[in-house]
């Protein structure tokens, strides 16, 4: 119908994961009440949903660490919307607002990523602009604050403020063969 003709190319996808452990004191293998800190269960979970339509994409991720599993940083304790973003990319220019995962070059200077199995996430909440003026040439600028567990983003004194620019020229894509 005409009502739905505008959204036929929209896509929604997502994923979720729940990891859990049940703790039982077993002094024969070194598990004591002290090592499990009185906890009976540790649960780490997340769910994320992404939406795309044409040049636009958006997404959100909910996380819950109730209580974080043994071996994970206790500062992960909590739950809520951990990440969100909206992005527009027409091939020449791309703008992203929200949580950004990226790297400059091979990642030695700047790299943000999340590794769920390790409880690591240093997403950058801010803005990124990518400009591709010619084949093989990419210019990138970004600004934001790094994630620090569940500390509010407004508390700048407790987190890193990152500003950066990056330029790349891939000669293999610049010349026709």
Language-model regions, residue ranges each:
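Outer-membrane beta-barrel channel domains
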Residues: 7-177
């Amino acid at each position: 119908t005409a009502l739905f003709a505008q959204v036929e190319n929209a896509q929604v996808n997502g994923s979720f994961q729940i990891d859990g452990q049940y703790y039982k004191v077993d002094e024969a293998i070194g598990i004591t009440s002290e090592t499990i800190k009185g906890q009976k269960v540790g649960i780490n979970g997340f769910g994320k949903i992404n939406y795309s339509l044409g040049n636009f994409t958006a997404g959100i991720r909910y996380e819950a660490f109730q209580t974080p599993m043994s071996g994970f940083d206790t500062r992960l304790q909590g739950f809520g919307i951990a990440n969100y973003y909206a992005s527009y990319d027409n091939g020449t220019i791309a703008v992203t607002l929200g949580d950004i995962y990226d790297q400059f070059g091979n990642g030695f200077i700047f790299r943000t990523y999340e590794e769920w199995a390790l409880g690591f996430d240093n997403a950058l909440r801010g803005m990124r602009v990518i400009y591709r003026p010619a084949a093989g040439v990419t210019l990138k600028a970004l600004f934001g604050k790094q994630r620090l567990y569940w500390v509010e983003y407004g508390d700048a004194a407790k987190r890193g403020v990152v500003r950066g620019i990056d330029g790349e020229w891939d000669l293999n894509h610049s010349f026709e063969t």
